[in-house]
């Protein structure tokens, strides 16, 4: 399985190297490492961003294109999509891991990081995510750059991420403001997730199962280009069919919606595996505009 994933990433890296982007616009979630309930926006664009370095990812500042970030933010706001804006965004493996695996490091290519809340209820309708992506796509079209859109997040999965409504008081406080954990606290948290993955693979975990059929349906919808189909998907249906963290596919929807602004596109590769050890339906796709 690891060899298959490594090959899929190598193919994606080759695709990106051939495209040679001037800018990466990345849509990604957070896992209560950078954004908390003390102020939880549905979307946030970063003009500067710092990776916290969780799960062994690279820590430190991303190479953020501030001018492009401001341009994107203005277009999104003028399109009627309310988006937060940050000059000091903190991001986790949702951003950093994808950048490292796809382009080599968090500073390899200038980036505009766009956070999409995918775990902290209440969540907005999926249609707003699509509209966000389209607005970002319109902004990118005016940048005079070769722009790579990346959506980073799991497919069906239900890892042990606490839900605010049911969490004990001490956990709620961490969800409200758990910034700057000690190394021991971060290690313990990551160990809980890794242990849950082992239990899940062994069939003894009490979390929701993966749903390959749901995952493949989503990938088919994204490949079809008819993204309005997701507008009818309720937030509850995500959780019921694919687990609480399946909302991370909002990043995929936004990335494909951004690409759709340039016209029809073609998916050039699709990789999918059901990986219980990672508590995730795992996918990698690449796509190009028909005119590319």
Ranges and model annotations:
Residues 1-21, 37-131, 142, 162-292:
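Flexible, D/E/H-enriched segments
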Residues 22-28, 114, 145-155:
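Beta-strand elements within well-structured catalytic alpha/beta cores of enzymes
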Residues 30-33:
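Short active-site-proximal "capping" loops at secondary-structure junctions
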Residues 133, 151-153, 281:
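Glycine-centered flexibility sites
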Residues 134-142, 147:
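Non-transmembrane, aqueous-exposed alpha-helical and coiled segments at domain scale
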Residues 154-163:
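Phosphate/ribose-phosphate-bearing ligand recognition and processing surfaces
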